[in-house]
């Protein structure tokens, strides 16, 4: 959803809820069901709010309603209004990924930059080592291109190596679907090493997605959140190359628990970059 003069106050209220201390997504949803809108939630009394979500979360809502986070809210809203590529999806938006909601991992808001209509398509997540070898990079490019040409969105985390190679493959596809990248930073602060690739992605009609405010920097906490979202974002996840104890293995296992189809590309038994993918195959990955 693009932000304009008509909807900016509603968006402002949603961002305030997102920034309320001690209020998680489930609590926000309960409040929205009881009060009917983000505006009404922010107008609620402390006692009424506390009856629904408890006192700590209620105090967080009252604080943002009184302006506690206005600087951050204003900065986010200014970015959304000034950049025509930028948008926002509330958890109530029809374009909000259903897989995230069903997984129980959904943040209240997703910030976007680029072509939001890609979220209507089926997606396949491709992930793997940031320090991949040549074979791994070739495989990632191959599958990125093939999946794009099959009419699906290639979704990757904002990392070098396998994810970047998969994006390059999708961008090289003949009449393919542009790829999407899930960021650990805000959409206005993409990783420097990926600047050129992400510019090409946006120019080709791709999409950047983040659970962080547009100007937010990447942090350990935001990477953990981003990795959790990867597990629930799509119904298919492919691990191209990963070390034995790589974090992506936990993401793949979580995706399998959520009902996603998980695949892994096997590699040589002496290749340390293949041991993680080989382990997933032994556990039942396709």
Give the label of every model feature segment.
Residues 1-92, 280-283:
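Short, small/acidic-rich helices and loops at N termini and domain boundaries
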Residues 1-10, 91-286:
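Glycine-biased, small-residue-rich flexible motifs in mid-sequence functional cores and linkers
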């Amino acid at each position: 959803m693009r932000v304009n003069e008509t909807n900016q106050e509603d968006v402002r209220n949603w961002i305030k809820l997102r920034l309320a201390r001690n209020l998680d997504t489930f609590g926000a949803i309960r409040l929205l069901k009881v009060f009917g809108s983000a505006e009404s939630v922010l107008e609620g009394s402390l006692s009424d709010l506390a009856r629904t979500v408890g006192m700590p979360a209620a105090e967080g809502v009252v604080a943002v309603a009184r302006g506690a986070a206005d600087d951050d809210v204003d900065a986010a809203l200014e970015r959304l209004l000034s950049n025509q590529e930028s948008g926002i999806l509330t958890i109530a938006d029809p374009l909000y990924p259903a897989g995230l909601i069903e997984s129980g991992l959904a943040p209240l808001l997703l910030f976007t930059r680029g072509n939001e209509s890609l979220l209507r398509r089926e997606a396949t997540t491709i992930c793997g080592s940031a320090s991949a070898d040549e074979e791994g990079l070739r495989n990632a490019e191959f599958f990125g291109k093939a999946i794009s040409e099959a009419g699906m969105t290639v979704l990757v985390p904002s990392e070098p190596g396998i994810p970047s190679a998969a994006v390059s493959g999708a961008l090289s596809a003949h009449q393919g679907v542009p790829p999407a990248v899930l960021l650990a930073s805000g959409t206005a602060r993409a990783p420097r090493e990926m600047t050129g690739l992400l510019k090409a992605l946006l120019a080709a009609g791709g999409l950047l997605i983040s659970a962080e405010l547009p100007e937010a920097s990447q942090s350990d906490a935001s990477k953990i959140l981003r990795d959790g979202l990867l597990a629930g974002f799509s119904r298919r996840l492919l691990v191209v190359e990963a070390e034995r104890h790589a974090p992506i293995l936990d993401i793949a296992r979580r995706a399998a628990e959520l009902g996603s189809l998980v695949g892994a590309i096997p590699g040589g038994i002496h290749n340390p970059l293949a041991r993680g993918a080989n382990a997933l195959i032994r556990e039942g990955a396709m």
